[in-house]
C-alpha cells in the first residue's frame, strides 16, 4: 500500500524514535571471567522476569583494560572496577563512574592504609624513614607498595630516575625490607631488583621460599607484614587499618600473634607524629575507596537509573537471585563485592570518588606509563 509522503515521514520518524529508545535501554556489561559471565546472565534473566525497565546484555572482555577500551569505543557500557583501575580508566580513557559500592551504606570508604610500628620505637618518623627497615604485604599491592611508595615519592624522600625504576629507588632508600614477590620474574624480569628488599623476609619453616609472593613466605600478606614488625625484623609495616584487630584477641592462633598486645603497637602519621591504633581516621597514608562502575560520561545517569532499579529488586533479597552474593559462582565478589550494602550514586567525577589522598598517591606513578 502506498503512503502519502507526509504519512511515510511520520512512520519513519516513529521507527527512529523506537530504535533509539530500545538502544538507550540496553546496558552492555563488560565481564572478565566465566563467573562474571554467568552472574551477568543470571542478573539479565531475573531482571527480564521482573519486567525491570532496561535490558542487560553481557559482553566479554579479556581484562579490565580491555573493558576500558570497549567502553570508550562504545562496544560496552559498564564494568565494575577496583580503585587503581578506575584511575586508569579516567586518566587514560576519559571514562567516569556512575555508582560506587558502599560497605556501610553511608560512604565509599573501603579501608585506610596505615603505618604500624612498635610502641617501643621512640625515634621513628614517617618523614625520616631513610635507612630504616620496612615490611610490605606484597609487591605491587595497593597497601604494600602503591600507597607507601607513592607517599615517599610525594614527600620527596624518594626520587625516581629517568628510567622510572621504583624498586631500585626503594632499595636505595630503605636499609632492608621484606617485599614478597619483588624478585619474581613478573616484577623483576632482568633479575636486578635490589636484594635488600628481601632481607627482612624469612621464608618457610625450612628457610625455603624466602621472599616468595605467597603464604609460604611467612611475612607475606598483611598478617605477615604485621608479624615482621612484631618480631622486630622491621621498623614499620604498611597494612590496612583492620589488620591488627583481625590478628589479635585469639583471631590468629600463631604464637607471634598470641603474644601481641594492642599496647605494643602504634600508628605513624604522615606529619611525623604518632597515634594509637584507634585513630586511623586522622592518622593514615591514604583512604582507599571501594569499587565503582566505570562508564562513559554521557551514560552516568542512564546506568545509575538501571542499577537503581536492579538494586531495589535484588539488593536485599534472601531468596532467589541476590545482587551482592556470589555463593553460586565458585568465588567471592563476582560483579560486585559480597560485602556491599548499597550502591551509591556518584555525582562528581572519578577523582571525587577516588578522593584526594589516593589520587595524589597514584599520580606518583605516572612515569610508569599507565596509558
UniProtKB/Swiss-Prot annotation:
A UniProt-annotated Pfam family: Transferrin
Gene3D superfamilies: Periplasmic binding protein-like II
GO cellular component: early endosome; extracellular space; plasma membrane; recycling endosome
Coarse class of the protein's main subcellular location: secreted
Signal sequence region: 1-21
Top-level division of the source organism's lineage: Eukaryota
Keyword Calcium in annotation: no
GO BP: iron ion transport; otolith development
Transferrin-like domain span: 27-367
SMART domains the record matches: TR_FER
Subcellular location: Secreted
Alphabetical UniProt keywords: Secreted, Signal
Subunit relationships: Interacts with OTOL1.
Function summary: Required for normal otolith growth and deposition of otolin-1 in the otolith.
Name of the protein in its database record: Otolith matrix protein 1
Organism from which the protein derives: Danio rerio (Zebrafish)
Organism placement in taxonomy: Eukaryota, Metazoa, Chordata, Craniata, Vertebrata
